[in-house]
């Protein structure tokens, strides 16, 4: 039997906690036998003293085991259970293509996703722009969709990693969110509860990233890869660029439209293509569906070219109560904003920098995201035809097309876009889309 205050004291004094102590504390968070003050105190001691790798693995597994852990054995699936997690960005619509692409190559992708947070868009919010789309199918239905379609993207239910919800709520109000062991456990507890064989982590770097510096993004990626592999799930991470909007669009319906166009081959933004392919390659190799990079790329290109990936996306939408002909008629189903017009720079020049976070917040301000959980979302608003770093803009080439609910909202967004995009008289050096691959 342990005492919560003795566990806090031990960590406060700089000692490592045992697996049993960590499990006792996490189960107490779940069972409400540990107070908010005690959670805050432990979070702060971890913030200042860090955690060893064994402690990090124990914390993550205890949080994972605080609720249901999915088990797929009874379905006798003929392929690996694989998933991807992103630290979030703007125009980061990779999940909507990646899930169907990997499923079309023989993987099974039970993606439990999130809503928008701060300036970053949420995959669930994007999917809810599709009429009727059900992000909370019951457990049996979720399993059926995975077996039949190969991919489902759903919301987190209260049975998955329940200790994380309470732990996170306390961290949020006690300035202990930005601790790498706590971030790692929070992310992985939910992902590992999916019962995965393999995971790829997309850790963003740059002006729209969750972590403020390249070094901290790399440290988070290394921590996640170390802990997930320590917990028995083959995991790699990619550090990818978020110094500009990833897709050509940012918003909800506008990003779904771009995802469908990507899958059907109508339009593929080159940077979005690079990141999506790189993440899919990791999933195929870690899931043992491909031996190496070249084989993985060939398989992925084939399911894009032969229409299989687009077909899987359509089947997923239909299975989750969306329209059965969504891929063919997406424009008919997706909401469009009242006002769509381009915004131009006041001077001409090359785009040298973008405050991606500010662009994400501009979408939120237009109604495309939530400032608090109770807010409703306007799925139709956002940006399309986003200019990229290095582009030359003038009176002919706009910075973006803004989709807004009225003139006032358009003006506010136009001001935000102009302020977020910096021009120079010479083209900047273009940063890579994928900086680094982390395997241990």
Curated annotation (Swiss-Prot):
Record-linked PROSITE patterns: THYMID_PHOSPHORYLASE (PS00647)
Keywords on record: Glycosyltransferase, Transferase
Pathway the protein contributes to: Pyrimidine metabolism; dTMP biosynthesis via salvage pathway; dTMP from thymine: step 1/2
A Pfam short name: PYNP_C
Gene (name only): deoA
Leading EC class: transferase
Name of protein: Thymidine phosphorylase
Enzyme Commission designation: 2.4.2.4
Quaternary state and interactors: Homodimer.
Function per UniProt: The enzymes which catalyze the reversible phosphorolysis of pyrimidine nucleosides are involved in the degradation of these compounds and in their utilization as carbon and energy sources, or in the rescue of pyrimidine bases for nucleotide synthesis.
Cellular component annotations (GO), alphabetically ordered: cytosol
Taxonomic source organism: Klebsiella pneumoniae (strain 342)
Gene Ontology biological process terms from the UniProt entry: pyrimidine nucleobase metabolic process; thymidine metabolic process
Family of this protein: Belongs to the thymidine/pyrimidine-nucleoside phosphorylase family.
């Amino acid at each position: 039997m342990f005492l919560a205050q003795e566990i806090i004291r031990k960590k406060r004094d700089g000692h490592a906690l045992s697996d049993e102590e960590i499990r006792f504390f996490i189960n107490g968070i779940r069972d409400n036998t540990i107070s908010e003050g005690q959670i805050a105190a432990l979070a702060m001691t971890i913030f200042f003293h860090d955690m060893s790798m064994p402690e990090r693995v124990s914390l993550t597994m205890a949080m994972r085991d605080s609720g249901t852990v999915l088990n797929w054995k009874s379905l006798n699936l003929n392929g690996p259970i694989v998933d991807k997690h992103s630290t979030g960005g703007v125009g980061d619509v990779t999940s909507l293509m990646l899930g169907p692409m990997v499923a079309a190559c023989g993987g099974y992708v039970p993606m439990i996703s999130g809503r928008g947070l701060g300036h970053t868009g949420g995959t669930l919010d994007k999917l809810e722009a599709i009429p009727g789309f059900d992000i909370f199918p019951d457990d049996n239905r979720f399993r059926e969709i995975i077996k039949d379609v190969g991919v489902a993207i759903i919301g987190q239910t209260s049975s998955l990693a329940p200790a994380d919800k309470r732990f996170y709520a306390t961290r949020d109000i006690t300035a202990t969110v930005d601790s790498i062991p706590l971030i790692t456990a929070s992310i992985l507890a939910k992902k590992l509860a999916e019962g995965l064989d393999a995971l790829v982590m997309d850790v963003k770097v740059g002006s729209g990233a969750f972590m403020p510096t390249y070094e901290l993004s790399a440290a988070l990626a290394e921590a996640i890869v170390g802990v997930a592999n320590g917990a028995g799930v083959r995991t790699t991470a990619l550090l990818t660029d978020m110094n500009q909007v990833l897709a050509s669009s940012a918003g909800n319906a506008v990003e779904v439209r771009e995802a469908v166009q990507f899958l059907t081959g109508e339009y593929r933004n080159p940077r979005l293509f690079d990141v999506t392919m790189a993440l899919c390659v990791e999933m195929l190799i870690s899931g043992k569906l491909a031996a190496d990079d070249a084989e993985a790329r060939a398989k992925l290109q084939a399911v894009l070219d032969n229409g299989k990936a687009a077909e899987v996306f359509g089947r997923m939408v239909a299975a989750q109560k969306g329209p059965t002909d969504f891929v063919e008629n997406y424009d008919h189903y997706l909401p469009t904003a009242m006002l769509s017009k381009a915004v131009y720079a006041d001077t001409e020049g090359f785009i040298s920098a973008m405050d991606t976070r500010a662009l994400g917040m501009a979408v939120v301000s237009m109604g495309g995201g939530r400032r608090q959980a109770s807010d409703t979302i306007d799925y139709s608003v956002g940006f399309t035809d986003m200019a990229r770093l290095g582009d030359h803009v003038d009176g002919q080439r706009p910075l973006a097309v803004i989709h807004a609910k009225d003139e006032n909202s358009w003006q506010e967004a136009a001001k935000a876009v102009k302020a977020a995009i910096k021009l120079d008289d010479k083209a900047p050096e273009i940063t890579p889309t994928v900086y680094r691959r982390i395997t241990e």
